[in-house]
Amino acid sequence: DSHRMSISKFRLHEKINFDPVILPKKTIFQLCSLLEEYDGDVKISNLKSKIKFELNNSILISKLIDGKFPNYVQVIPKNNQKKLEVDLKLFLDSVDRVASVSLDKKDGVKFNLAKDVLNLSVNNTNSGDGKESLNVKFEHDLDISFNSRYLIDVASQLDGEKIEIFFNDTGSPALIKDPSDFDSIYVVMPMKG
């Protein structure tokens, strides 16, 4: 969607010619489900307006979305020099706890950052307030808010022990990385106000 993006690369054993395609979100979820317990090769065939994935005893065929994919590279932040580093599990659990105060997971989690401290807060007039403080590595002062569901979704995808979030300013997208994974990055837009 226009508020978040993930980019993952993986290396192929051999170079192949394959025109870029756009897959429906439902197809991606179905493919991920098939791949969860699978560790073999996947044969991918581009059939004009359809794509076919063959793995073991399963075949998934899907229509493709017409059109050309937007230039996502221009959306990746390039000047985010303010680096936050924190334990992944602590971060994920804290965001989840603070967000649980709100009835609506779309409510913003406010980050109040100072030197080596991240204060997380949610304020919902109907269900109350939630606050937590984490010790982090950070060298700046910054106040910024994010949709809690987006943060939880991204953090849940990471496998390492740490999460790194790179900021520019309050209104610019954040770049999120797992320092142990050089092939994936995540971009999340902050909430306004």
Question: Regions from the language model: what does each represent?
Answer:
Residues 75-78:
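Short hinge/gating elements
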Residues 71-72:
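Specificity-determining recognition surfaces
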Residues 1-7, 14-65, 80-193:
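DNA polymerase processivity clamps
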